[in-house]
Amino acid sequence: MKLFDYAPLSLAWREFLQSEFKKPYFLEIEKRYLEALKSPKTIFPKSSHLFYALNLTPPCAVKIILLGQDPYHSIYLENSQELPVAMGLSFGVNPNAPIPPSLRNIFKELHANLGVPIPCCGDLSAWAKRGMLLLNAILSVEKKQAASHQYIGWENFSDRILARLFETTSPLIVVLLGKVAQKKIALIPKNKHIIITAPHPSPLARGFLGSGVFTSIQKAYREIYRKDFDFSL
């Protein structure tokens, strides 16, 4: 079985990225991920949600990109069952999962900037459906092992996704939180897209709260689309 048998990817994205799937780097990603999936190790998010960010936001609908690093590797308990916090969206979590500190800070800054009520649920699917691509640079992780799937090569693929999107004629709003995400600035054509940077929202970093990042996103969105982005959840 092939990768897309385990991890469905929408036709729109398969057509958009079709030139990538036979390249040696992608075949190596497929091989390594499937080996990990078939091993005794538990891999997050569930394979059905590996490409969830792409499936919720077709390439023609992308207006904002919020780039994350890699999925949450933690679990939570629901009816005595261990479930992954990760759901395939950068910073977002499964609807019943506790809200992680980074996402809690995102909600605090959003409220401080735009007055959006702080949600009680960390599912960001609504943003994705409105045109915010919530893409992680690394798409999978081993349970309780942070950054454990760097070796798979996902960043080669996510870089190609970004590069293909940056080739589009419409201006995109690219939000890069933290130094790791900001390394992607080199991929972005100058004077074509709007780049917004801020510190990482983790409590271990400093400067995210008070950065005004959502004010900047909304200002850019208004300039392009003459309306506000709906941040409600």
Curated annotation (Swiss-Prot):
Keyword flag Metal-binding: no
Gene Ontology process terms (BP): base-excision repair, AP site formation via deaminated base removal
Keywords in alphabetical order: Cytoplasm, DNA damage, DNA repair, Hydrolase
Record protein name field: Uracil-DNA glycosylase
Chain's role: Excises uracil residues from the DNA which can arise as a result of misincorporation of dUMP residues by DNA polymerase or due to deamination of cytosine.
Location of the active site: D70
Keyword DNA repair: yes
Enzyme Commission number(s) of this protein: 3.2.2.27
Gene name of this polypeptide: ung
Protein location: Cytoplasm
